[in-house]
């Protein structure tokens, strides 16, 4: 019996949950999460509290309830799941069942074969075409990077 290969594109919230569920359903599967950004399994509902200063440690947004940071090492050690951060999925070949990926920092490219593919890419905010939308300080709050930026702006204004 061959090992099932599962690729999950997206590492914010739904992707890691889907990967963990896949692990519970198949202890022998080769599971890989592909995440474009540097962070995994973020508690995005906590972004406003971090930006507002309710807590200062951004790692609280990516920690387990026991305080362990959910990084690639955590996913490998705790769940046997490979997590590729800073890696963008650039193309899907459904016929050959492969995902082409590129590391956004190094430019290194690789191809991941899959038997099952899970798309959990989340949402992309739409910035409406209104006057002033391109002014400095106008942003959205969707990612850890956005939360860090807003926190910095808040701190500079004090």
Regions found by a protein language model. Give the residues of each.
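FAD-binding core/adjacent interface of flavoenzyme oxidoreductases
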Residues: 2-7, 69-158
